[in-house]
Amino acid sequence: NSHTGRDIFALAENLAIFQRASALEKELGVPVAHEMHRGRVTFSAPSTVLLLDALPDMRLTADFSHWCCVHETLLEDQGESVERAIARSFHVHARVGHAEAPQVPDPRAEEWRPALEAHLRWWQRIVDVRKASGASTLTICPEFGPAPYMVTLPGTGRPIADLWEVNRFMKDFLTDRLVV
């Protein structure tokens, strides 16, 4: 997993970085997946699609939570770009984002069910595409993080949910709901 490039670099600068990463990948025999992440060139659907067009061998770490935050939607209007990213995804960061933040406070809460189900659909598509391509593996990491990703109570800094329990829930949710 690599946090490659920056959102503030020109496309040519980012392409040079990705081409170097690709050369290292080939030289060392270590696969590299470039994470979809805010602050990186993969921060948005359109910027990522530009890279996918220019770099036919580019692999992604799918973290749609960042795109939800950046685009302020559950990506209903980004279907083609989401499918393009799914087709290149080799690793999944299973964090659930929403229109205003890259991490829901607690995916077990009913008010976050639409966001959880949207992410599950994307993750299932990744599983399906990987299987159809003959891939024997797909790695998935529940990736709910501590503050500042995790919302805290004002004045105390205490997290509003138990991070360990949230990630355990995600592991169990993925095990129960993904059809592999």
Where are these regions (language model features)?
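Histidine-acidic metal/acid-base catalytic patches
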Residues: 49, 54-59, 68-180
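Active-site glycine-centered loops adjacent to acidic/histidine catalytic or metal-binding residues
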Residues: 63
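Active-site acidic/histidine proton-transfer and metal-coordination neighborhood
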Residues: 1-60, 165
